[in-house]
């Protein structure tokens, strides 16, 4: 079999307040996060957005101690996974590849090559697949592989998503049950799943399976839980004026309060590690919205982190992937495109010289408008609460 490695993929997060700006730049410079018709606009726009959002984001990170715990927790998960595999007699090095902050995926691949790894299991720490999370990391890995003959020699097997696995479902159900049982009337607690949202266009135009997998995942968790509690699925972290998957978490919380719900158990279903979206967005922002709306008891299910059932299930998954590889990197980076975003019969987009001239003018006007808003502190983005 040769030397075995496991590459855990995750988002990454700023560990210090001074890291926030560069982290946001890396995030918004990813074309899978912000899709633009002109690649040359990506980096200038990323610089602009990150410059505008850094101060507000730093305030949020101050609320959770001045930095993200994501790297530390992911390292703990990697250590636990390596030990679990070792206990089974499977020697494997476990690496961490973050998409937008250290240790970057590129750093992990360099170490994997230096260690002489022959077989690599690529395992995203996102239970459900989305083109903006696992998909972005897979595409980065494919680009690195395409231009690196040494990387091409490594036998890579990929796990696109794994939300259906029984160990994961059991671990989630166990954590939910523990929070429900803290209530005076556990059977009355409303289970509230909050998933990270994505723009509707990702699902309807790009064919992203994320919404389907999230909805299927919530049903399977409730089936595994085996209780009759009412439950709701909503989507958080919406950014910008475009339509995202609904219902939005803040709206759903207020609606439940209007319906008389008093006991709420919130489940961060997209995340397996504590980070800014659980510790600040859910624990602080959404808690405040819920309590102001009339919800009296707001309990939040902890992220899986190094839950024994979760780590055991990841170990099972690695062993099964080594025994029966199902997907290559190339298999998970070619997503079908369902419709054209800019139909040619309605609008010339980059086909003729005249179209290119108008496209350039429109893009430049938009960029200048953003710069004016940055300098004046007034404009539609401020009105929408984005800046």
Swiss-Prot record:
**UniProt GO cellular component terms:** cytoplasm
State if Translocase is listed as a keyword. Answer: no
Pfam families, sorted: Ferrochelatase
Q: One GO BP annotation here?
A: heme biosynthetic process
Q: What does the record give as the reaction this protein catalyses?
A: heme b + 2 H(+) = protoporphyrin IX + Fe(2+)
Superkingdom of this entry's organism?
Bacteria
- E.C. designation(s): 4.98.1.1
Task: Indicate the enzyme's highest-level EC class.
Answer: lyase
Its biological purpose is as follows:
Catalyzes the ferrous insertion into protoporphyrin IX.
**Name this protein carries in UniProt:** Ferrochelatase
């Amino acid at each position: 079999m040769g030397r075995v490695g496991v590459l855990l993929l995750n988002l990454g997060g700023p560990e210090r307040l001074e890291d926030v700006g560069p982290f946001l730049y890396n995030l918004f410079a990813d074309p899978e996060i912000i899709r633009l018709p002109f690649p040359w606009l990506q980096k200038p726009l990323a610089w602009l957005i990150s410059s505008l959002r850094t101060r507000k984001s730093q305030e949020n990170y101050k609320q959770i101690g001045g930095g993200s715990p994501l790297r530390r927790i992911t390292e703990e998960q990697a250590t636990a996974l390596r030990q679990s595999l070792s206990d089974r007699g499977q020697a494997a090095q476990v690496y961490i590849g973050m998409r937008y902050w250290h240790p970057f995926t590129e750093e992990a691949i360099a170490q994997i090559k230096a260690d002489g790894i022959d077989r690599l299991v690529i395992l995203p720490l996102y239970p459900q697949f989305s083109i903006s999370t696992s998909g972005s990391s897979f595409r980065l890995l494919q680009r690195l592989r395409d231009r690196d003959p040494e990387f091409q020699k490594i036998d890579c097997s990929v796990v696109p998503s794994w939300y259906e696995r029984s160990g994961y479902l059991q671990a989630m159900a166990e954590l939910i049950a523990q929070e429900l049982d803290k209530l005076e009337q556990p059977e009355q607690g409303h289970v509230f799943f909050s998933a990270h949202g994505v723009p509707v266009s990702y699902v309807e135009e790009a064919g992203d399976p994320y919404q389907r997998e999230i909805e299927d995942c919530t049903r399977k968790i409730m089936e595994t839980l085996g209780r009759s509690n009412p439950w709701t699925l909503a989507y958080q972290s919406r950014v910008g004026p475009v339509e995202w998957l609904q219902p939005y978490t803040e709206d759903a919380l207020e609606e439940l309060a209007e319906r008389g719900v008093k006991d709420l158990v919130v489940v961060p279903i997209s995340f397996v590690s504590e980070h800014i979206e659980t510790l600040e967005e859910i624990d602080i922002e959404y808690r405040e919205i819920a309590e102001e709306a009339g919800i009296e008891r707001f309990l939040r299910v902890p992220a899986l982190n190094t839950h024994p059932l979760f780590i055991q299930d990841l170990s099972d998954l690695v062993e099964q992937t080594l025994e029966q590889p199902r997907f290559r990197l190339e298999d998970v980076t070619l997503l079908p495109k369902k419709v054209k975003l800019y139909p040619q019969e309605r609008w010339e987009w980059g086909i003729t010289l005249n179209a290119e001239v108008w496209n350039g003018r429109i893009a430049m006007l938009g960029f200048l408008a953003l710069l004016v808003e940055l300098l004046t502190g007034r404009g539609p983005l401020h009105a929408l609460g984005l800046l």
